């Protein structure tokens, strides 16, 4: 416990908060170029082939980003937009690729939560067929 005199001399130091997505540098999103697109397996209780991409950002930092949704058109040298948000069962993956932006296509035939996957509104005639 400091004395009053020590507090007058030095004051209290403010603890700096640690960010969950440091590569974004306090920006909501950042643009980058895919250097490698591949699949990886999740941590212990889960089993799948998760689609991820290694992305070199505009600030020269290289990160691993998750590709959400079913199917994608990404390959090496694709320009992508990344946002924060980790994938709980993939260690080291702290970013998501934004679907429907830049070179990334939206998810095809997506009917629910479309805005999160960059999918356009389905045509009225097709919606009746899907409903049954």
Swiss-Prot record:
It holds the Pfam family Ribosom_S12_S23. The modification 3-methylthioaspartic acid is found at residue 89. GO terms for molecular function: rRNA binding; structural constituent of ribosome; tRNA binding. One of its GO terms (biological process) is translation. One of its GO terms (cellular component) is small ribosomal subunit. Keywords: Methylation, Ribonucleoprotein, Ribosomal protein, RNA-binding, rRNA-binding, tRNA-binding. Disulfide bonds: none annotated. The keyword rRNA-binding applies. The keyword Metal-binding does not apply. Residues 103-132 are annotated as: Disordered. InterPro entries: NA-bd_OB-fold, Ribosomal_uS12, Ribosomal_uS12_bac. Coiled coil: none annotated. With S4 and S5 plays an important role in translational accuracy. Part of the 30S ribosomal subunit. Contacts proteins S8 and S17. May interact with IF1 in the 30S initiation complex. NCBIfam families: rpsL_bact. Belongs to the universal ribosomal protein uS12 family. This is Small ribosomal subunit protein uS12. The lineage of its organism: Bacteria, Pseudomonadati, Chlorobiota, Chlorobiia, Chlorobiales. The gene is rpsL.
